[in-house]
Amino acid sequence: MIRTWLSDIRPLYEEHRYRRYYDTLPAFRKEKADRLRFQKDRAQSAGAWILLEKIRKKYRITEKAAFNLSHSGDYVLCSVDMECNEQTQVGCDIETVKEADLKVAKRFFCPSEYEAILREDNQKLQRDMFYRFWVLKESFMKATREGMALDMSSFEIRLSSPPVL
């Protein structure tokens, strides 16, 4: 079973709080955070790892468990395979909702996905559908470990309950 947690990282925008958590990070994660220019980006990077470590500790999850992290705006997301099955692939994505760029959808989504967006009655519903496809597609791409190297139009999301690839 894969479980997902969301955390608000705004407290990490305060330097003294960030520093307190930063000091607990492993060296490789500190290096990653240190390469980032803006405090908000450093807080996202550190916050995602801190969330993962809290989950590992609380649920006694080994480091072998598949996981995936995402961040956007003031939030970080962490999905973890609770059963630690080596075959499990985990991907997650979170996005701050802005205006939907239909040119992006037309260029990168499958025709059926783009058409589903256009069928929505108004811009708000189109935006919501755009982001629904976006986070599902990016989550899948991350789970495959190919990330953005995988062409978004090379696979189709069919919205049902649950979504189907």
Which residues does each PLM region occupy?
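Core catalytic alpha/beta fold that binds nucleotide/phospho-ligands
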Residues: 1-165
